[in-house]
């Protein structure tokens, strides 16, 4: 008998899809804030203005590099739901640092450090750390969501269909985020008039929304899926293959023994570098052409 999709069966899938939308949305918001923050935080910087602005994206994606593998181990240890909630809490903390950076720049804008001939306010460094936390959260959430969506037994669907739908929603978030930055966060404001106080309310609202989503997730029924994570604690970066020894025990091989995985890692490294480099620095180039 063919099972039909119900709200109960689709609930975890829809919840994770919505969180994946948030990941795409905030990833692009972070990158598109480089231009306005270049004026709000770095107006007194001359020689290294673009370099410091680009560090915002560098800090964000540094979170992926340093914390993805750790999240995999955490997932094996505590399961999907607890890892998901911790990931969301990191996102709330990152937005709190964003908010703090705006408040410090607004009320203590004269506090900062001199780097060479340039003055860099403390608010910039706080935003930079918040960007790292946001990247860490995005990496953690992807480690949780991707395998869960692929393995979740939603009636009448295939893994590739579920992944395509979830990724499409994620891409929709990245598509509308620039309009949010220009049409909401800095609506009706010229580049010359951009200031840190315009960041306060948007970041506060986003932080409250993510905090509510985290609370809702903690109350939701998010079942663990058997056979999708390593239960033992002494195995790292290994997969089981078919038995081939005399005793019939399964042999273990490193995941790096798979050639196509190595090629995929190299490919996605260059792809993401190109995607982020062009997308996040195009606005900086446009601002330079306009004399900002």
Please annotate each region the language model reported.
Residues 89-120:
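C-terminal ends and interior cores of transmembrane alpha-helices
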Residues 161-186:
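Glycine-rich segments within core transmembrane alpha-helices of 12-TM secondary carriers
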Residues 54-75:
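Central cavity-lining transmembrane alpha-helices of secondary-active solute carriers
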Residues 177, 181-189, 202-234, 238:
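C-terminal membrane-cytosol helix-exit motif in multi-pass small-molecule transporters
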Residues 11-41, 142-146, 278-286:
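Extracytoplasmic
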Residues 30-34, 253-292:
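Extracytoplasmic gate region of multi-pass secondary transporters
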Residues 1-23, 115-118, 123, 252-257:
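Cytosolic juxtamembrane N-terminal segment immediately preceding the first transmembrane helix
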